[in-house]
Amino acid sequence: MGSSANTETNGNAPPPSSNQKPPATNGVDGSHPPPPPLTPDQAIIESDPSKKRKMGMLPLEVGTRVMCRWRDGKHHPVKVIERRRIHNGGQNDYEYYVHYTEFNRRLDEWTQLDQLDLDSVECAVDEKVEDKVTSLKMTRHQKRKIDETHIEGHEELDAASLREHEEFTKVKNISTIELGKYEIETWYFSPFPPEYNDCVKLFFCEFCLNFMKRKEQLQRHMRKCDLKHPPGDEIYRSGTLSMFEVDGKKNKVYAQNLCYLAKLFLDHKTLYYDVDLFLFYVLCECDDRGCHMVGYFSKEKHSEEAYNLACILTLPSYQRKGYGKFLIAFSYELSKKEGKVGTPERPLSDLGLLSYRGYWTRVLLEILKKHKGNISIKELSDVTAIKAEDILSTLQSLELIQYRKGQHVICADPKVLDRHLKAAGRGGLDVDASKLIWTPYKDQS
């Protein structure tokens, strides 16, 4: 969304032509009339050279780096990603879409000029020259919070694809959504149909996931919508938690809407339009009004690589409740029912690997603590449905594997196991396998 160049005058009048009359004088001495009084804005600029210099910077170019006041009241370094004119504003009246360089792209937002410290302006950087990854400068608390809430999509992208992806999705198109009783601030761009390009906020039916431009449309829809839970089969219920299996082929519109919704909170997720190939497992909190989606994961119906999970999301309004860990555990319970080992789709992001490594660590160490005698990696894989390579890499990262006489040996000192278990943290909500009523997918065609 480039901006066309504007022709600007320098404010100086052209010299009079030969056939023009000289300006009238004001008195016998031939002097010019006194200039008109300065406006307040002009007076400020004239009396404050720094103000004049700052005004000369405007509008800021895309790529400019500057300090920006965030909602915490503090200034943070940002990079201008895009700009747009303010309706009915002056020549230099723009809003600026900025990326906080210390933080994840999900915090990118439109800002007003008064949030920017023009004294800190650095000139625009050529994107072709600058091809660096900004290191995250976070406190331990901030990093832990992002580790616990971050969810990752189907795949990470190579450098060229990542640049193309970030250019196409650099400006968030939908700022907020309403879903059930929550108004949720979105994190990323999602490729909604063109007719929704002018929307800042979307209204979702929390049961069928149809989305609308206006609140009145949602209210009319809710009076007619018969659904009180996701379509598909309820395969698990324990207390107030339910899990529904949704076939992307049988419920195509729901599955596509779920992908649109998920992309608002997943950065490098590939949006699959061919949802026929996937099953979606939608986790809900249930009450007397219905079953309210809190998150989901998807998996391919047929995976040659033994992937048991393609994409996973816990909605922001339900995070930090253990649902992400529950979804990972549930994917392995399905693998056990299938009689197969499973693994998440690769490659994993750093934070995605962190989530899985935490799950694998807790599951494996609990077994090693209780087990008496020798146990092989294959036996651990058979019991847990975790792929042998994932078990080996996890135990190696904990330094619990030694190579002796041509084979890997697990060294499970009880004190060491306890220390690692404590470091791994809580396991989240437990999946009660006895409540799972499910038959593995078989192609009906």
UniProtKB/Swiss-Prot annotation:
Induction: Up-regulated upon UV-B exposure. It is found in: Nucleus. The active site is at residue 345. It catalyses: L-lysyl-[protein] + acetyl-CoA = N(6)-acetyl-L-lysyl-[protein] + CoA + H(+). A zinc finger (C2HC MYST-type) spans 202-227. Disruption phenotype: No visible phenotype, due to the redundancy with HAM1. Ham1 and ham2 double mutants are lethal. Autoacetylation at Lys-269 is required for proper function. Its EC number is 2.3.1.48. GO terms for molecular function: histone acetyltransferase activity; zinc ion binding. Residues 60-118 form the Tudor-knot domain. Its main location: nucleus. InterPro entries: Acyl_CoA_acyltransferase (IPR016181), Chromo-like_dom_sf (IPR016197), Chromo/chromo_shadow_dom (IPR000953), HAT_MYST-type (IPR002717), MYST_HAT (IPR050603), Tudor-knot (IPR025995), WH-like_DNA-bd_sf (IPR036388), Zf-MYST (IPR040706). Disulfide bonds: none annotated. One of its GO terms (biological process) is DNA repair. Belongs to the MYST (SAS/MOZ) family. Knockdown expression of both HAM1 and HAM2 results in earlier flowering. Histone acetyltransferase which may be involved in transcriptional activation. Acetylates 'Lys-5' of histone H4 (H4K5ac). Essential for gametophyte development. Negative regulator of flowering controlling the H4K5ac levels in the FLC chromatin. This is Histone acetyltransferase of the MYST family 2. It comes from Arabidopsis thaliana.
